[in-house]
Amino acid sequence: MNLPLEVVFNKSAAKSLEALDAPTRKRIKDKLEAVAADPLNPRNSYPLQGTNKRSARVGGYRILLLIQEPNRLAVDIIEPRGQVYRRI
């Protein structure tokens, strides 16, 4: 049985998460739990072309992630869809 990955946030992602309303914050945390449990499942996240990052969708928000070995999921960016891909 595979253990879920440890989820770590960089400073800007943590700040973005805390700035969101409570229901959206909960939905994002739930999605991160699902990604940590099975990060390569296409229902949870998908690879971004030209990078080593993955993206997860929660409503109008996108979460950019990086799977770090051996058991860490780094949350890089949490932003609205219209803004997030400009920062890659």
Sequence positions of predicted segments:
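Residue-level signal for threonine
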Residues: 10
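Enriched for short, Lys/Arg-rich terminal
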Residues: 1-7, 15, 19, 25-26, ...
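A short, surface-exposed loop/turn module that caps and links secondary-structure elements
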Residues: 33-56
